[in-house]
Amino acid sequence: MTYSPLPADLATAKPATEHTREHNKAVSRELPFEDRRSFDNAQRGFIGTLEPLTITRGGNHVTFDLSQFEFLQDQAPDTVNPSLWRQAQLNAHHHGLYEVCPGLYQVRSFDIANMTIIEGDTGWVIIDPLTSSESSAAALALANKHLGERPVTAVVHTHSHADHFAGVLGVITQEDANSGRIPVVAPLDFVEESLNENVLAGNVMNRRATYMYGNLLKPGAKGFVTTGLGAALSMGTTGFVIPNDIVEETGEIRVLDGIEFEFQMTMGTEAPAEFVFFLPKFKALCMSEITSHHLHNVYTPRGAQVRDALAWAAQIDESVQLFGDRLEIQFASHHWPIWGRENACEYMLKQRDLYKFIHDQTLRLANTGSNKEEIAERVKLPDSLGHEFSNRDYYGTVHHNSRAVYVKYLGYFDGNPATLYPLPPSEVGAKYVQFMGGADSVVEKADVSFQSGEYRWVAEVLNHVVMSDPEHIPARSLLADTYEQLGYQSESAPWRNFYLCGALELREGLPEGSVFKASEGIARGMPLENLFRLMAVRLIPDVVAEVNMSINFEMTDLDENWLLTIENAVLNAWPDRQAVQPTVAITGSSVDIKMMFLGLTSALDLIGSNKLVVTGDIASLAGMNEWFATFSRRFPIVTPRPIEG
């Protein structure tokens, strides 16, 4: 559904209201801003950087740019929570190559994550090669410039989130990994979890991620200031390689180019597949993303599986038990290190108690009968945890993490039958507006509440108006202004970005977008099992209601055959099975077949170039392109969604 942009005078960003100014002043009074330890640690060991820090693809397409963040040199403005402003300064103004200790280096703020570089006997061991090839290649080039040219001799992916692996082709080639020439080490279930998260639900996650990471916001005091987790997310070329060395159990040892790694499995915590590791040579513990200098997400607003806060706390505790008496340095995949055993262990134990407090108190209140919304209002950290900057809501929040713990144990339903079978948003919006005297009446009353600073309430009631009538200009305008004030007040960067992106979309309409497709790099690395799972998700039931067919696939580049069937409007696929009398048989390379199904090439082109051979009832494939849904990258979020079959 499309709708017209607001008139220019209504579409401009507004200043902070008096209520917002007072809210942010209260934060300034509450927290110990005189504590500068984080700034000292963030700048320690600096070697060099790129000036300006602008990374491009092909010389003209900008994929990452920190040159726009000079405004963060100033004092926090009224339009940014001062605590979040502090985190933004730490993330954006400390970029480049840093020595953690001799032989152990990090490139920070070339992307949302850090790339760690370890000097091995003959080359570089790379930990977490960022989100895009452009950023990882630039980070490696910076290290080679300042530390001397060395080849990459191993890659370690700490976990299954794209900002830690999708830039891998910027530091090695596909053949390096496929041949085993360069070890690529990852945790158990890495491939399945990486592709499940980034492919099966990839389109909806990517769309919501544009809100969470503020991709469409302009940097500035009324716009984007940080992601909280890092300075910004790179928007370059992504890829994927299948690891050739899988770590399965705590205590496993690997020696990579002469450097010993001692692994601890931390599955199902911050990511479904994750490990941390200790480096005895450096007395350094890499906590991956299990600890960071903020409260992380037990549930991420971009959408993902709810994480286990209790297991998360337990894994941090286990790290202290396993390595606490040996470590001198603690570093991670985001933010800055901590030096000194006592400092590092104190920090880790407070991170442990942060997640355990939220877990325990959520369930205490749930057992009294409180629902997730009531619990979120009541769970408050004790000052011993809440006044630590490394525990603040810069990414996750106590509010939405407590709701996540509730859902982890009890699901979305709160037991009240009124919420068991709800109406969809557009329909419920129309009925609320009718009951409340019509849209004009609702907007008039909402404006009074806006003037009183009741922004959460205004957002709730005006959402009903906009969902029932997105062309109601006064409602959209006031709702945009409301989201904006909520964003200005937010300490969480994702909350700020969600609110400000919602305001932008209400004012300017949907951004232009294309059809979602996996990248060629992802396609080449994707196992066939994951490809067929994705095709099953894309199958449109009404279109294939009468289809009953089987397809034998013979992969010319693999010792592998597959059987695919479509019946009952469901696609199933199995390896090492073939139908005796298939409807169709297709022979070709696995890469070409993946590229065809993912829309990166066509069957006609492959057949015409003799890369694909099709036999059997070829006519049964007529219209096959219509069987599978294509997903728009830019579906509406703050206005009614189109009804899909």
Segments (PLM) and residue ranges:
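Divalent-metal (often Zn2+) His-rich catalytic cores of metallo-beta-lactamase-fold enzymes
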Residues: 4-23, 294, 311-374, 378-415, ...
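Conserved beta-strand hairpin/beta-sheet module of binuclear metal-dependent hydrolase folds
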Residues: 90-150, 275-279, 283-289
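Active-site metal-binding motif and surrounding structural segment of the metallo-beta-lactamase
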Residues: 122-123, 133-185
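N-terminal pre-domain segments of enzymes
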Residues: 1-89, 93
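TPR-adjacent "capping" and linker segments in tetratricopeptide-repeat scaffold/adaptor proteins
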Residues: 350, 418-441
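Feature captures hydrophobic
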Residues: 445-448, 454-460, 467, 471, ...
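Metallo-beta-lactamase
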Residues: 99, 123-125, 131-134, 148, 191-267, 311-323, ...
